[in-house]
Amino acid sequence: RLKEHVGCQDQVIAAYGGFNRVDFWGEGQFRTSPIMITWERLNELQDHLMLFFTGLSRTASDIAAEQVSVSPQKARELRVMHQMVDEAINILKSPHGLGDFGKLLDEGWQLKRSLTGRISTPYIDELYERARRGGCTGGKLIGAGGGGFLLLFAPPEAQAGVAAALDGLLQVPFRFES
């Protein structure tokens, strides 16, 4: 048993692999369900994603502990965030464009930021706003918050503008695997 407050999402995702929905409940209880979309749709999603290292590191357990402590007061926000999972999956499975996925990411990021003041920092907020002005429509920090990697959603034709807006940050190439 870990003696730190850390989420187990990363561990479950790494252990199971694939493109899955993971639902958590109770102490260490979870269920994984594959998200069934075509390889073409997954590539379309991939083509809209950009990953940047913020240059900041943080202690995830401190941020996670604060999130746990405020969870009862933030039940509405957490419920909305949970409902957004179904909406995201519906967007991915629909035959329409992915534009709404970026908007949903932005909405989710704003909700997550409202959970605790330690999710973001003025520097992260500035980076996110620069990316938005550059053409991204949504994004989020990967992990507990406070630093690490910024995942952004931008149409392929806007990605040069996003990269220019975040000049000086390391863009990390990545690909989904089959």
Task: For each feature predicted by the language model, list its residue ranges.
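C-terminal nucleotide
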Residues: L2-H5, Q9-K140, L151-S178
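Glycine-rich active-site/cofactor-binding loop and its immediate structural neighborhood
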Residues: G147
